[in-house]
Regions:
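Core segments of cupin and vicinal oxygen chelate
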Residues: 7-10, 16-61, 101
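Vicinal oxygen chelate
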Residues: 21-23, 69-127
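Basic/polar N-terminal segments that are highly enriched at the extreme N-terminus
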Residues: 1-7
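Compositionally biased, low-complexity repeat tracts
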Residues: 5, 42, 50, 75-77, ...
Length: 128
């Protein structure tokens, strides 16, 4: 049996995703999904911007780190290890209806997940 580490003070802080168009991502995550920009820092010497967005204080709830590399012109390769970012809502059916009206592409209509009963749906952000 392996030993357990002392996890006192551990918490999930953020997940980082790279975005091609920071303003389009702000529009999607903040205006469409209701997140707030928690902080944004430009790094001119490195030619990138980091922005942290979320629904609560960065010190209290997990957030997304959006990294915008200024010279990136091509879409990012997501690889086969990346899955998704989950955002929970009270009514996934209504949320998808509202998002569709705003032009958001729903890639999996709301319904029970395979081999389960939890209702899920998927949509695309500006980077797909």
């Amino acid at each position: 049996m392996s030993k357990e580490a002392n996890r006192d003070g551990y918490r999930l802080a953020h997940t980082m995703i790279r975005v091609r168009d920071l303003e389009a991502s702000f529009n999607f995550y903040c205006k469409t999904l209701g997140m707030k920009i928690l902080r944004k820092t430009d790094y001119p010497d490195g030619r990138f911007t980091n922005a942290f967005i979320g629904y609560g204080l960065e010190t209290e709830s997990p957030c997304l780190e959006l990294t915008h590399n200024w010279d990136q012109k091509e879409n990012y390769d997501k690889g086969n290890g990346w899955g998704h970012v989950c955002i929970e809502t009270r009514d996934v059916y209504k949320a998808c209806e509202d998002l569709s009206k705003l032009g958001v592409k729903i890639t999996r209509a709301p319904g029970p997940m395979k081999h389960g009963t939890r209702v899920i749906a998927f949509c695309e952000d500006p980077d797909g």
